[in-house]
Amino acid sequence: MTQQCNCSEGSCGGTRYEELVLERMLYSARLKESVARRDSDVIVAMASMIADTFREGGKVLLCGNGGSAADAQHLAAEFTIRYRSSVHRPALPAIALSTDTSALTAGANDLGFDEVFVRLTEAYGCPGDILIGLSTSGNSASVLKALEFARKRGLKTLALLGGDGGAIKPHADLAVVVPHTGSADRIQECHIAVGHVIVELVEKMMGYD
């Protein structure tokens, strides 16, 4: 049920705000559609790589900063706990590198923040594992360095990026780049949508659907 505004006409900007809601949400939907149509094959390939890694006893590491750190943690939880209550399966090993406050602050203090995810990848990553880097700009130094290190260590690398992919894209075996610049919000919305689809695909590929 739609509630009517009781203020004098126009004083609360109701119609203007409703137009903003439509503009933002419809643009977000169009952006997701653009990514889906352009990169559906890449998304399927990412899911296949992750499923193969889990089957072989490997794990997934994820890293990002700010909202991307939250997205990394969100997706790790979907793997380790569950995605949908209708699917019953074992836990799948995924670790968000942005969740340990002591490790993050010690690394930032002793090594510099750009080296934090490198150090954690060194601690937890093994050849054959996967590191997923999330960066709305495609240029986050800490994520870039972690992906560079991961490749040298023998990990596979995936990335969810924005803009033109930035400096990180060449260091990812597979990357989904959201074609948006100027703000992180719409990119993050696409990243979490892509991540959810990947988790669902992994479950299906592993026979848990």
Swiss-Prot record:
GO molecular function, one term: carbohydrate derivative binding
Binding site for substrate: 65-67, 78, 109-110, 135-137, 140, 188
Cofactor comment: Binds 1 zinc ion per subunit.
Residues passing through the membrane, by range: none
Pathways involved: Carbohydrate biosynthesis; D-glycero-D-manno-heptose 7-phosphate biosynthesis; D-glycero-alpha-D-manno-heptose 7-phosphate and D-glycero-beta-D-manno-heptose 7-phosphate from sedoheptulose 7-phosphate: step 1/1
Residues where Zn(2+) binds: 74, 78, 188, 196
EC number: 5.3.1.28
Cofactors: Zn(2+)
Family under the similarity heading: Belongs to the SIS family. GmhA subfamily.
Annotated protein name in UniProt: Phosphoheptose isomerase
